[in-house]
Amino acid sequence: MQTIYTKITDIKGNLITVEAEGASLGELVQIERADGRSSYASVLRFDARKVTLQVFGGTSGLSTGDKVIFLGRPMEVIYGDSLLGRRFNGTGKPIDREDECFGEPIPITTPSFNPVCRIVPREMVRTNIPMIDMFNCLVKSQKIPIFSSSGENHNALLMRIAAQTDADIVIIGGMGLTFVDYNFFVKESQRLGFADKCVMFIHKAVDAPVECVLIPDMALACAERFALEQKKNVLVLLTDMTAFADALKEMAITMDQIPANRGYPGSLYSDLAVRYEKAVDIAQGGSITLISVTTMPGDDITHPVPDNTGFITEGQFYLKDNRIDPFGSLSRLKQLVIGKKTREDHGDLANALIRLYADSRKSAERMSMGFKLSNWDKKLLAFSELFEARLMSLEVNIPLEEALDIGWKILSQSFHSEEVGIKEQLIQKYWPKACLHK
């Protein structure tokens, strides 16, 4: 049932206040202006008869006498195969200059998937990036962010992951993107050959902040339907969650909410968690794997956005100096696949490589301070150069099995077999034969 009101009592930023009854949170509202234009809004808060609405597209040209029509349903997005290869804005309208998209309208705010129907993650998602596949495995239905330092090319990493995984559908949610970023996503998806199975929901930096908040909900609502009804394995890429949090912050300040840490709303943790919890592996169905980008202002990992994110997600990839830092990265689900879905030497070899690389960092520090280096220090430094060039560089693009073989070769070129701390049975089986008695 639609209800029409014509008394707007307050206009502040992209928010308006209307005296109305019977409104519900998230309800979609249509605003008809005196000049014939119309726009949409959603219910953000209500207090007795005062209902606060967030207006999509801004409040410019709005007057207090315009018609406000409560539509009696939540914000919706179109779902169906017609979405594939298309691009939409924060209100669900096409921005790719193609025809209108037709399909089933679905609400964008739904509860997380029923835990009874979830299954324990058990399948590895291969990316051909050694620092992920070898040391911090990505697991199907995992929710994991990329913590990115300033100036890092995290968008290129996202697109590479999207192109090299076996996901049936890729859904990209871009928030606060510049035109250069948006154009990069479009061109790269075409160049890498997955544009036809990709859906993009894009909020540009010039768009209203309230539309930014809707992007993750739209992307995840469509992903959930694809996974549940069509049993598709969906990869959802969200960037940048710091822009999403900043939009929440701006809206909270406009509504005169009492700020919490660094001005962000006290609900920041819940606002992030309700999106990340959409990641799921469905029994006898598909899956949703969620990778997000969280930029760290000032490279500060204690900033409220990465700090709260770390408590919600199942690890993180720490992107720094154009490489994934092994010491700041973690996958809490890797033990579910290492040695079970991968080669038997995977766990021991990865642990040995990281341990020796950590020791090499100490040797490099001693060298920088002018200390005399031992033969062991020199071995570690030689190993470090090989490790960084052949496994850590983001230019490396090889399958996991080849990365494991390269790991053994690096060890054999730098150390004796008894110096690496790996079980003898694995040494006998995988250590390069020409170097076995080195």
From Swiss-Prot:
BP GO terms, sorted: proton motive force-driven plasma membrane ATP synthesis
Can you provide one Gene Ontology molecular function annotated for this UniProt record?
Answer: ATP binding
Q: Which UniProt keywords apply?
A: ATP synthesis, Hydrogen ion transport, Ion transport, Transport
Q: Which Gene3D superfamilies match?
A: 3.40.50.12240
What does the protein in this record do? Produces ATP from ADP in the presence of a proton gradient across the membrane. The V-type beta chain is a regulatory subunit.
Entry's family note: Belongs to the ATPase alpha/beta chains family.
User: By what name is this protein known?
Assistant: V-type ATP synthase beta chain
Origin species: Chlamydia trachomatis serovar D (strain ATCC VR-885 / DSM 19411 / UW-3/Cx)
